[in-house]
UniProtKB/Swiss-Prot annotation:
One of its GO terms (biological process) is arginine biosynthetic process via ornithine. SUPFAM superfamilies: L-aspartase-like. Its EC number is 4.3.2.1. The keyword Lyase applies. This is Argininosuccinate lyase. It comes from Tremblaya princeps. Pathway: Amino-acid biosynthesis; L-arginine biosynthesis; L-arginine from L-ornithine and carbamoyl phosphate: step 3/3. Keywords: Amino-acid biosynthesis, Arginine biosynthesis, Cytoplasm, Lyase.
Length: 452
């Protein structure tokens, strides 16, 4: 491609080091679509004949089909998917293939192909997010009245319904889906026609080309267009945040399904065993989701670090964005699929959850509120219940039933009597009493499930 400028060919180590076709060939079908749209633009500008355009379109169709079938021999010495596609096209259709590079640079082609590819992959990720949301919704409906301990600081705090807990993750995923939609919309900008950095002498109607590729608008500045990787950074961050949310869900499911906690059971088909310990049942897929979240966070930070060191315009540093894009998309779509399977297989141990609530002081806050209804200030009622809890713990008693007994001599007799009357060990009462919008009561949990 540039052999006329140099007196010797690029050496093999440099070819190997600079080649990206090993991973960016996944964008082959998108690159073929971009090249076809560009050639149609050349035809409209009367730079390419209708016969040559027909040859190019036929050749690109064969290239795309060959790539899907694994029939293309990718050549690392051609560096990337873009030159490989053009090379195979030229082998198929001859001179018309060599005309395809007229009026464009790899700089604007690379950016446009990545944007088209991102639109497809973000759409696939959105579908997988919706699949996980449906799985969470199904499990939420099945446990609308199932009570479980809600935690703060990893300590039992207050009772919540399992439906409320799972719906919280649906809320996170809903935000993730909205972010992906916004990110996709921002990426749908045509940069083709910007050339290497200054534009092109063979520019056609860029708006028509954008329509051909399903892009919303055209870039207003060629310098910015070829060097802009905001869409990569935004997509990487969207994927990283999504993976953080899945990692949090995975962490909860790992804890629930551990033999020490025993709040839930995962399906056998989703777990693995040990090579030495016969009794083990390991939630490997959930642990891998946690790890992939860390990798994607690193990728998002990495591409921002790559970009912060560059002035205008294009630099070869930007080649590294493909690994981030491809890695993030692959990790997100696969993780979403296995998380949906894990959620569908999840079975809560209702009796274990109930016993854990009964052996805790989870509704102590409700008792303090009840004393407020009897005329105490909340600060005073909080102190009274806290004293009773402290006495119960020091006496070795567990659970709410011990509070009335342990309150004697700790709080005034009248308050102790009130505490005995209102003590209610059924955690469901605590949940049903919550009347604030978005609370854990089944009424609001049901409404949240319908909205999420």
């Amino acid at each position: 491609m540039w052999s006329g400028r140099f007196s010797s060919p690029v050496c093999a180590p440099v070819q190997s080091f600079t080649a990206s076709v090993g991973f960016d060939r996944a964008m082959c079908h998108c690159d073929a679509a971009v090249l076809a749209a560009h050639c149609r633009s050349l035809y409209l500008r009367r730079v390419m004949s209708i016969a040559d355009l027909a040859d190019v379109e036929r050749g690109l169709s064969e290239v795309a089909m060959g790539a899907r079938a694994g029939a293309i021999s990718w050549r690392p010495e051609l560096e990337d998917v873009h030159r490989n596609v053009e090379h195979v096209l030229t082998e198929l259709v001859g001179k018309a293939g060599r005309m395809a590079h007229t009026g464009k640079s790899r700089n604007d082609q690379v950016s446009t192909t990545a944007r088209v590819w991102l639109r497809h992959m973000a759409g696939a990720a959105i579908c997988r997010v919706e699949e996980l949301e449906r799985a969470l919704a199904a499990r939420s409906r099945a446990c609308l009245n199932t009570m479980m301990p809600g935690l703060t600081h990893m300590q039992v705090a207050q009772p919540v319904t399992a439906a409320h807990y799972l719906t919280a993750y649906r809320c996170m995923l809903s935000r993730d889906r909205s972010r992906l939609v916004r990110c996709t919309r921002g990426a749908c900008v045509l940069t083709l026609g910007s050339g290497a950095l200054a534009g092109t002498n063979h520019g056609g109607d860029r708006y028509t080309t954008a329509d051909m590729l399903g892009l919303h608008c055209v870039s207003p500045n060629s310098l910015d267009a070829v060097s802009d990787r905001d869409f990569v950074m935004e997509y990487a961050l969207c994927c990283a945040v999504l993976m953080v949310h899945m990692s949090r869900l995975a962490e909860d499911m790992i804890a629930w399904s551990s033999s020490i906690v025993g709040f839930a059971v995962l399906g056998d088909a989703l777990c693995t065993g040990s090579s030495i310990m016969p009794q083990k049942k390991n939630p490997d897929i959930l642990e891998l989701v946690r790890a992939k979240a860390a990798v994607l966070i690193g990728g998002a930070m990495g591409i921002m670090a790559v970009m912060k060191a560059q002035g205008l315009a294009y630099n070869r540093d930007n080649q590294e964005d493909k690994a981030v894009l491809l890695g993030a998309s692959r990790a997100v779509t696969r993780s979403l699929s296995v998380m949906a399977l894990a959620v569908r297989s999840l079975r809560l141990n209702k009796s274990r959850l109930r016993r854990r609530l009964e052996s805790s002081f989870a509704i102590a806050t409700d008792l303090a509120d009840s004393l407020v209804w009897h005329g105490m200030t909340f600060r005073d009622s909080h102190e009274a219940v806290a004293r009773a809890v402290g006495v119960a713990i020091r006496a070795g008693h567990a659970g709410l039933r011990a509070l009335p007994l342990c309150s004697r001599g700790v709080v005034p007799p009248l308050l102790a009597a009130r505490l005995a009357r209102i003590a209610q060990p059924d955690a469901r009462v605590s949940a049903f009493r919550k009347d604030s919008t978005g609370s854990t009561s089944p009424k609001w949990s049901f409404r949240a499930m319908r909205r999420a």
